[in-house]
Design a protein with these regions (language model features):
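ATPase/helicase motor core of nucleic-acid motors
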Residues: 245, 274-275, 339, 379-459
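Alpha-helical scaffold elements adjacent to nucleotide-binding pockets in ATP/GTP-utilizing enzyme cores
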Residues: 36, 62-70, 96-100, 122-126, ...
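Short glycine-/polar-rich loops that comprise or flank the Walker A/P-loop
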Residues: 17, 45-49, 84-87, 243-245, ...
Length: 459
């Protein structure tokens, strides 16, 4: 049986109101989340009344797997008969919003999500129709398109009224775009628009609002620190401000990394001010790392000095100190996970090549070292190691050194949308269609592109 810390057990047992779980890195939050949901089912909470929002589809898959495991465990104990997930919703807030929107408002049943690439292709193909050539302030067409897409995202995330803008050309362009993607045969909604549309429908229709608020009893929100204002508005609507449904928010303000997408750490910092009867529980035990790694992480987020460097900390954060522990079966206690030599290196290099040599040396030193992986002792492999870089532009010296030593690697990451492989392939295809010379996409030479007007629209 799983052994829980005092705080983890408290998070599992609390039933007297809304819950804010501050979960430090490696603190077992997914285990606590899945166990709490399974326990609610065993207590008779209808599965169809439970929502679990995750930030990604991958996280949703992991949570589903964990909940199934916990439900199966409860069935073996004789506490439930059915170990299936049933109609528990586990997934992203965008997918949930589209699903619910189609269910409560038939006119949206033909709509589909428009992803970033298709949105960009539509805007490119309808550049003149949308009047984007009239917009000022950009140095090129591609820069105009980038700014227009970002403007659209901000409009929906921040719930802005387009008609209040001072730039009439921008107002016209936004309306032209909105009318185009929502008319047949397109019927598209962006990720941000989906939430905006659902929020609008619930707010404007009292009967639908009452129906939705009576339907759900428990709303779980993972990675709550990355929730933006529009998403928070929807969560409050679904839960009637935490009065008809219990909101269990799980996150860590120290791990907020999506502010560039509109997420605001303020939501997690002020959760207790917006919802009634909130209990805050902090899961501060890191089961993943040693003391040295946790110590440097604590120093980073609290603004302490590390060596000769000042590490930038958050000006406002929830008080917490992460600790490194593991459960010792022999003593039946949680004990500190002590640091080992080499857990943390703080190095300064005179050149990129010197840094690359150090990294390659460490990889070769670590290869084959005995490692306890989920109870199985094995040697470390290349697949157990990763190199984090500021951007793909900083990888060449490292990859050159890895190549020289025949160390296998895979580069993962994303380039800009208009420099992506997909866009290059589409561009090449259009060049073939129009018997035009293929030119590698260059943001500064966007005038040389030719696009087929119907390429991005639905068949």
């Amino acid at each position: 049986a799983m052994i829980y810390t005092t705080n983890q057990q408290e998070a599992l047992d609390y039933r007297d109101g809304n819950l804010l779980i501050i979960a430090c890195a490696g603190s077992g939050k997914t285990q606590v989340l899945s166990r709490r949901i399974a326990l609610l089912v065993s207590e008779g909470v209808p599965k169809e009344s439970i929502i679990a929002f995750t930030f990604t589809d991958m996280a949703a898959g992991e949570l589903k797997s964990r909940i199934r495991k916990e439900l199966a465990s409860l069935r073996e104990e004789g506490r439930i008969d059915d170990a299936s997930l049933g109609e528990i919703y586990i997934g992203t807030i965008h997918s949930f919003s589209l699903q619910l929107l189609k269910e409560i408002h038939p006119s949206y049943r033909n709509y589909d999500i428009i992803d970033e690439k298709r949105q960009a292709a539509i805007i490119v193909s309808k550049y003149l129709d949308f009047g984007l050539d009239k917009l000022q302030g950009a140095n090129s067409k591609i820069e105009t398109i980038r700014r227009f897409i970002e403007t659209l995202n901000i409009i929906y995330r921040e719930n802005l009224d387009v008609d209040n803008f001072k730039n009439q050309d921008l107002i016209n362009s936004v309306h032209q775009y909105q009318n185009f993607i929502k008319q047949r045969p397109n019927c598209f909604l962006t990720f941000d628009e989906i939430i905006a549309e659902l929020t609008s429908v619930i707010e404007s229709n009292e009967a639908i609002r009452a129906q939705v608020q009576n339907r759900f009893t428990n709303i779980f929100v993972d990675e709550y620190q990355d929730v933006d204002d529009r998403q928070e508005q929807l969560i409050r609507l679904l839960s009637n401000d935490g009065q008809t449904a219990v909101v269990c928010a799980v996150g860590d303000d120290d791990q907020a990394i999506y502010r560039f997408r509109g997420a605001t750490v303020t939501n997690i910092l002020t959760f207790e001010n917006r919802y009634p009867s909130v209990k805050r529980i902090t899961l501060s035990t890191n089961f993943r790392s040693s003391h040295a790694i946790v110590e440097i992480a604590n120093a980073a987020v609290s603004g302490q000095r590390i060596g000769r460097r000042n590490i930038l900390g958050l000006h406002r954060r929830l008080p917490k100190t992460m600790k490194a522990q593991h459960y010792n079966v022999a003593t039946n206690q949680f004990e500190e996970t002590m640091a080992e030599h080499g857990d943390v290196w703080n190095c300064t290099f005179s050149s990129e090549n010197q840094e690359a040599n150090f990294i390659a040396d460490r990889i070769q030193e670590l290869l084959g070292i005995p490692w306890n992986s989920a109870g199985t002792l094995r040697g470390l492999s290349y697949a157990d190691m990763s190199i984090l870089c500021r951007s793909l532009n900083y990888t060449k010296a490292i990859t050159d050194e890895l190549d020289r030593r025949n160390i296998p690697y895979i580069i993962k990451g994303s380039k800009g949308l208009f420099e992506s492989a997909e866009i290059k392939v589409v561009h090449a295809a259009f060049c073939l269609l129009f018997d035009s010379q293929y030119v590698t996409p260059d943001p500064n030479q966007f005038d040389r592109y030719t696009f087929y007007d119907e390429a991005a629209t639905r068949d």
